UniProtKB/Swiss-Prot annotation:
It catalyses: N-(5-phospho-beta-D-ribosyl)anthranilate + diphosphate = 5-phospho-alpha-D-ribose 1-diphosphate + anthranilate. GO terms for biological process: L-tryptophan biosynthetic process. It comes from Mycobacterium leprae (strain TN). Anthranilate 1 binds at residues 103, 134. Belongs to the anthranilate phosphoribosyltransferase family. This is Anthranilate phosphoribosyltransferase. The gene is trpD.
Length: 366
C-alpha cells in the first residue's frame, strides 16, 4: 500500500473547515469523529502544528470516548505517511511476506522481552520477521534495550534493515528513527502518564507493512479496535491479550485472541494447557534491566528449559500461525501444531542461537 506524504485536508468529509475546538468538542461530548477529523488532528501533531495542550487533550478525550477502528486507522495511516519508508516491493520480491511480533507495552508487569525472543525463534524457523519496536515503556528494559545489550545495532536505516531481512531473515525498525515526526506526541504521551490512544499506535505503524503479526495489547478494551484496523488492511494477525493483563500470549492463565483473517475478526479464548504447557506464575516471567534480560535470551536460545522458554515457544508459534493465515487454506489446530513444532525445533537445533550470532555480526558490519 502506498500512502501519500501530503498533509491531510483541512476540511472534513462534509466540507467544513476543521479546527481543534471542532474535533475536541465532538470527543468531549462522547461523539465519534467524522471521516477525516482524526487524520486532520494527527496531521497537525506530526507536522508540529499542534500545541502540547492540544495533543494532550486529544489523546485523553479520545481515550475517554473510546476510539473506533476507523479513527485509529486514520491516525495510523497519517503516522505511516510521515515514516521513513522501507523498500517493501523489493523485500516482497526477494523473500515474500513478513511477520511482526510486537506489543503495546504498558502492562506494568516487567516481564522478560518475550516478543524479542520469539522474533528470533520465528526467523530461525524460516519465517521472515520485521520487528518494529522501541525502548522500555513500562518495564526496565524494552525490546530495543535488550537487542542493544545482545550486540544488535538498532540504529540501522531503511536500506540496512531491508538488507538484514534479506540476508539474515530478520530486521528491526527502531521506532524513533523511522517515525521522527512522532517526537511531538512522544514527549506529551510520557508527560500524561496514563495510557491513551497513542499507546496502541506503535504495533499499527510498522513502516515495512508486514501483512502478518502476533500483536499484544495490554488494554483489553482496545484490542478489538486494533483488530478492526488490521481487518481493514486484510492482514493476517492475532491480536492477543493475556487474561492476566500481559500484552503477550500468557502461560499463567488463558488469553483472549482476536483472530484477523480475510477481513474478518473472530474472538477466541486460548488455553495453552490444551497444547501441553504447564501453568506458570507471573513471577517466573519477570525480567530486569537490559543486561539481565539479554542473559535470559541467551539462556533460552542455548536450550534452557522452564517457564520462560515455554512462553517464548508459545508466542513464536502464535506468530507462525498468523503467518500461515495468509493462506486461505490454513486450519487453526493444525497450524498451531506446526507452529509449536517449528518453534521448538528452532531452539533445540541451535538455529535460533546461530541466527542471533549472525544478526549481531551483520548489524555491526553494515
Amino acid at each position: 500500500m502506498v500512502l501519500s506524504s501530503q498533509p491531510p485536508s483541512s476540511r472534513s468529509a462534509t466540507g467544513s473547515v476543521l479546527s481543534w475546538p471542532q474535533v475536541l468538542g465532538r470527543l468531549t461530548a462522547g461523539q465519534d469523529l467524522t471521516r477525516g477529523q482524526a487524520a486532520w488532528a494527527m496531521g497537525q501533531v506530526m507536522t508540529g502544528n499542534a500545541r502540547p495542550a492540544q495533543i494532550a487533550a486529544f489523546a485523553v478525550a479520545m481515550k475517554m470516548k473510546v476510539p473506533t477502528a476507523a479513527e485509529v486507522s486514520e491516525l495510523a495511516d497519517v503516522m505511516l505517511s510521515h515514516a521513513r519508508k522501507l523498500p517493501t516491493e523489493a523485500i516482497c520480491q526477494d523473500i515474500g511476506e513478513t511477520v511482526d511480533i510486537a506489543g503495546t507495552g504498558g502492562d506494568g508487569a516487567n516481564t522478560v522481552n518475550l516478543s524479542t525472543m520469539a522474533a528470533i525463534v520465528v526467523a530461525a524457523a524460516g519465517v521472515p520477521v520485521v520487528k518494529h519496536g522501541n525502548r522500555a515503556s513500562s518495564s526496565l528494559s524494552g525490546g530495543a534495550d535488550t537487542l542493544e545489550a545482545l550486540g544488535v545495532r538498532i540504529d540501522l536505516g531503511p536500506e540496512q534493515v531491508a538488507n538484514s531481512l534479506a540476508e539474515i531473515g530478520i530486521g528491526f525498525c527502531f521506532a524513533p528513527l523511522f517515525q521522527p515526526s512522532y517526537r511531538y506526541a512522544s514527549a506529551v504521551r510520557h508527560e500524561i502518564g496514563v495510557p491513551t490512544v497513542f499507546n496502541i499506535l506503535g504495533p499499527l505503524t510498522n513502516p515495512a507493512w508486514p501483512r502478518a503479526g502476533l500483536i499484544g495489547c495490554a488494554f483489553g478494551n482496545l484490542a478489538e479496535v486494533m483488530a478492526g484496523v488490521f481487518a481493514a488492511r486484510r492482514s493476517s494477525v492475532l491480536v492477543v491479550h493475556g487474561d492476566d493483563g500481559l500484552d503477550e500470549l500468557t502461560t499463567t492463565t488463558t488469553s483472549t485472541i482476536w483472530r484477523v483473517q480475510a477481513g474478518t475478526v473472530d474472538k477466541l479464548t486460548f488455553d495453552p494447557v490444551e497444547f501441553g504447557f504447564a501453568r506458570a506464575h507471573l513471577d517466573d516471567l519477570l525480567g530486569g534491566d537490559a543486561q539481565t534480560n539479554a542473559a535470559k535470551v541467551r539462556a533460552v536460545l542455548a536450550g534452557a528449559k522452564g517457564p520462560v522458554r515455554d512462553a517464548v515457544v508459545l508466542n513464536a508459534a502464535g506468530a507462525i500461525v498468523a503467518y500461515a493465515g495468509l493462506s486461505s487454506h490454513a486450519e487453526w489446530s493444525p497450524a498451531w501444531d506446526d507452529g509449536l513444532a517449528r518453534a521448538s525445533a528452532a531452539i533445540d537445533s541451535g538455529a535460533a542461537e546461530q541466527l542471533l550470532a549472525r544478526w549481531v555480526r551483520f548489524s555491526q558490519q553494515v
